[in-house]
Amino acid sequence: MNTAVVSALIAKLTAGCGLVLLLPLLTALFGEEPVLPFIYSMALCFLLAAFLRYKGKKKVINLNPRDGLAVTALSWICISILYLFPYFLSGLLSPLDALVESISGLTGTGATVFADLTVLPKSILFFRSLTHWLGGLGIIVIFVALFPQAGKGSARMIDAESTGPYSSRAVPRIKEMAKALFAVYLLFTVSAALIYTLLGMNFFDAVNHAFSTIATGGFSTKNESIAFYDSTPLKLSVIFFMVISSANFGIYVAAWKRGIRVLWENTEFKVYLSIVAAATILISLNLMLERGLYAPSALLEALFTSASLSSTTGFISYDFEAWPHFSQVILLILMFIGGCGGSTSGGLKVTRIILLFKSMTAVLRQKLHPRAVIQTRAGGENFSESMLLEVFCFFFIYTMSIFLWTALIAASGADIPSALGLSIATMSNSGPALGQFGATCNWSAMPAMTKMVVALSMLMGRLESFTLLILFLPSFWRKNGW
């Protein structure tokens, strides 16, 4: 690994994240709230950036794959640690709790260790939502879009941070694509904030919830989340923005250039919409038959919760802990799958589900016709054996990690259903789980061991395992290669 190059790029990222703290600092100034936690946190960011810049290389032209992975993984770890300080220095959280809150925000998980949001300063509430927005599209993507000075290494870093087996990484002009993705991201955020304001939210709440929605994060300014707002039009608008944020943002760029038909031609997005529709129908029928709800109420409850958990946003409008077990199992499946590759959603990704299904049918056809050459295709694209192997490996790591986290959380005292639900919720970055960690619960009373497990699980889920796990390979740190 080229330590000088990696240090130089992480220095730029940490300095940029220090500048981001100006926004909550200004919020604190205008609201006459404590500003020192943000000033000290900014100082730490700039001091670390200066140290890394001193150790780093002045001019970065290229990155090899290993350096790109190192920059992405280490910058996420570094920024997660730096962003715990506003919480800790405010005297609101312990260091471990502050780290969990920081990681939950940046990874878009959206679960909180705060027991009561109503007592928090507005600057802290805004900072929480801002971490969602920064991590949603991706720290690296936003960095490349605003400060495109990493040379050809930009593609390496974005490749390591991207979600799904294929996404914006396939575009050769990566800097232009990063700018286009950021423009779409910003447009959606501003649109959501304006519509939420028109539908009854105050401006501060609208901005915070817009950050959370488009980043598919889930942090709210209210303890009750979206359930606080008893407004059907508002809930429908939140559903709309959660769903569009679950699609590959690259298709919006393509739709701008080639027309809206691109959206309807995208196989992955159509499959995602079908999954949400099927879950909504099944859950609403279950609620009508077992809970006696009227059809309109059942449909709205089912649609909102299906959109929230499939997009891994995690907003709560209804307590699904009171739902029948059949509906809860469907919600777990939605969290496990998640949204589309190249979106702000977490989870396994619909793309991988499609490829796993296509691979299964290809194997069955190969059994019938042993001499046939069968190519796996999805969305009009051929997938190589190496790509399919990566999908299978990711599926294995994803599921085995969930089982491992379940065992560790259960060892800390949780029952198995609660531990399994929490493991899926953190690996998929969806937030709310089931049982002890359900829709109306927070993580304030969670054992320290469990908090450490979920912190690692959230990071692994956001960086899609490979980027983080590769740091544990001894060969990764050798100077002369693998």
Question: Which residues does each PLM region occupy?
Answer:
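Membrane-proximal intracellular helices of multi-pass ion channels
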Residues: 1-482
